[in-house]
Amino acid sequence: DDSFKPQQSITRAEVAAIVYRIYTGDVKDAYVKNYETYNKFADMAGAGWAKGYIGYCANAELIVGDGTNFYPAQTVNGYQALAMILRAVGYDQNDEFKGSGWEIRVASTAQQLTLLKNIGATSLSGNASREMVAELLFRALVYAPMVQYTSAFGYQPVVSLTNVNIYDGTVKVDLNGQTLGMATFGLKQS
């Protein structure tokens, strides 16, 4: 109905749709139908409108489910929403958001990236509201540097070359970590 309903809980399918859009930049959903048959999950029969989003995100390893099912109609808690968002930025390439204690690792990573400002840990364990997910997505788009993982160096920022200046034969280069918002939508930090 085109309304936001900020206090309403958000489902796993809805978060997958949002993560797809911020990760690909396909905000008009021009290509999402191409991914409807890419699903690895057994419970997609009732996913309807969300099949393409879930298919893309599953194959890009932005969502994981339980290995067999995704449970698209279930609501997400804050930890689950954060895990999906952090995967879009580049985290969990070393599977640190899986297994025992994954919630602590998700919260710790989000805290280091300042995504949890004014959001308490108790808020993360309950159903995530649309408002909370919107705030977390905004912070991830604008402030969290995208990363790549290598076994030798761990997580390293994806670097964009900016402000290349040649003055008096001297080359000055500023390297800035690139956020998902910069990469996908050309957003700039002020």
Language model segments and positions:
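Feature responds to low-complexity, polar/acidic, surface-exposed segments characteristic
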Residues: 1-16, 20-51, 59-79, 86-127, ...
